[in-house]
Each structure stands twice: as structure tokens, then as C-alpha cells.
Amino acid sequence: MGVERKIITRGSGPSPASGDKVSIHYTGWIYDPKKANKGFQGKQFDSSRSPGRGPLVVNIGQGKVIKGWDEGVMQMSLGEKSTLTITPDYGYGDKAAGKIPANSTLIFEVELLKIN
């Protein structure tokens, strides 16, 4: 349970610490185990790369985002792109959040662009 990180592209910089302001590009999907073996991530629910959007800027490790992001992003290095698979207890738990049903496993492709 928790967060599993799979590196797509290795970074070459430092990792953020709790309280650091980070800039992140991300795309999020609701995991669908019935279709996972066909290379399907799930149903996309959000992306910072959508037209008119930009990177998310947030203080990491401060509970401003879901626990899976706080833990997963702090394991990344600057410039890294990774897939984070986040179980419900590290996501939104038993509560629905917008387009995300309760008890959903989430998949995020996350790119750590900047650490301030």
C-alpha cells in the first residue's frame, strides 16, 4: 500500500525536501485493473499539459496535495519523469473527489521541473 515509483527518465539534480516549492507537469488517470494488461493506464481525469494550463507549483511534503504525491515527489530528482501508482489510502481514500470515485487507485505521470 502507498506509492510505487517507476522512473521513465532519470533526473540529474537534487531531490526536493519537505517544504520546498516545486513545479511539476503531471497527467492523472484512474487505474482500471481490467484493462491494465493491454497497456491502458485508465481514464484520464486531469493534466497540467492541457491547453491553457501550466505546471503545478506547490510546497511539497506539507499536506497540500495527496500523501502519495508528497512521498513520491520527494523521492524524485530534478528533471526526472516518473510514473507514480498511488493506492487509495495515499490518494483520496473512501471519499470521492471531483471526477475521482471513492477508493480509486491513481496513476500519475509526473515530471519534476523546478525546485525553489
Swiss-Prot record:
Inhibited by both FK506 and rapamycin. The keyword Isomerase applies. Its main location: cytoplasm. It catalyses: [protein]-peptidylproline (omega=180) = [protein]-peptidylproline (omega=0). Transmembrane segments: none annotated. It is an enzyme of class 5 (isomerase). GO terms for molecular function: peptidyl-prolyl cis-trans isomerase activity. Its EC number is 5.2.1.8. Keywords: Cytoplasm, Isomerase, Rotamase. It is found in: Cytoplasm. GO terms for cellular component: cytoplasm. Gene3D superfamilies: 3.10.50.40. Residues 19-116 form the PPIase FKBP-type domain. Belongs to the FKBP-type PPIase family. FKBP1 subfamily. PPIases accelerate the folding of proteins. It catalyzes the cis-trans isomerization of proline imidic peptide bonds in oligopeptides. This is FK506-binding protein 1. The lineage of its organism: Eukaryota, Fungi, Dikarya, Ascomycota, Pezizomycotina. The gene is fpr1.
